[in-house]
């Protein structure tokens, strides 16, 4: 009788940043610019949308994206321009429990990498603010590569650049589409919801002590 294939151990962790280690949300800014929550949500759903923002994540300059929207929605010109000019106010802070986990992994010598959908223009603001970004052995920023998740090419680029074995790498992200794309390429994956669940998984993988 054939024996089951042994479980391949996890040797490295590849992290998403926003929503996992960093609390980024445009609402942190726009709740100050709108007195009415419904109006704010309508603006984010129909003007400065997630799809529009992802174009900057994929390399489009903010000045180009902003002026495109101002031409379409001149009544919201000030609010649209604030997305660029006051972008730093969308960063509420670090997800401290997740950062603590990252620090424990680092202390144990686990190779750590990041793969993030982030504007190349705005990522220096994150580097200046979050010292823990220096803990990574490598960070791949979508805006610098002009590729964004869940495009399979950006995962393949991470594999090549960081010399990863997907079957030995745990990918952590809060977006289901990104998790699904990584899984198709052979990564072990974890859909991030809260730090305790991530910690439990890392313990079960043998990367953190019980």
Task: Show which residues each predicted segment covers.
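Residue-level marker of regulatory loop/turn positions in helix-turn-helix DNA-binding domains and
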Residues: 94, 115, 147
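Short, proline-enriched alpha-helix->beta-strand connector loops that line the catalytic pocket
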Residues: 108-110, 135
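Generic structural signal for small/hydrophobic residues in well-ordered secondary structure
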Residues: 16-19, 59, 105, 114, ...
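Alpha-helix C-cap/termination motif
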Residues: 72, 105-108, 129, 161
């Amino acid at each position: 009788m054939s024996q089951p294939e042994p479980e391949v151990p996890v040797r490295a962790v590849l992290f998403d940043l926003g929503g996992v280690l960093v609390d980024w949300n445009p609402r942190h800014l726009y709740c100050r610019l709108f007195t009415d929550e419904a109006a704010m949500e309508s603006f984010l759903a129909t003007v400065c949308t997630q799809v529009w923002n992802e174009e900057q994540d994929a390399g489009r300059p903010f000045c180009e994206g902003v002026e495109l929207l101002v031409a379409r929605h001149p009544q919201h010109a000030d609010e649209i321009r604030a997305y660029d000019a006051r972008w730093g106010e969308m960063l509420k802070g670090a997800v401290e429990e997740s950062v603590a986990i990252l620090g424990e992994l680092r202390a144990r010598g686990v190779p750590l990498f990041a793969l993030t959908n982030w504007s190349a223009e705005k990522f220096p603001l994150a580097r200046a603010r979050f010292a823990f970004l220096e803990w990574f052995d490598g960070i791949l920023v979508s805006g610098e590569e002009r590729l964004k998740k869940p495009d399979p090419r950006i995962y393949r680029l991470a594999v090549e650049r960081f010399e990863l074995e997907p079957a030995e790498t745990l990918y952590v992200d809060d977006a289901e589409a990104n998790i699904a794309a990584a899984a198709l390429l052979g990564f072990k994956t974890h859909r991030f919801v809260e730090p305790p669940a991530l910690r439990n998984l890392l313990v079960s993988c043998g990367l953190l002590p019980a």
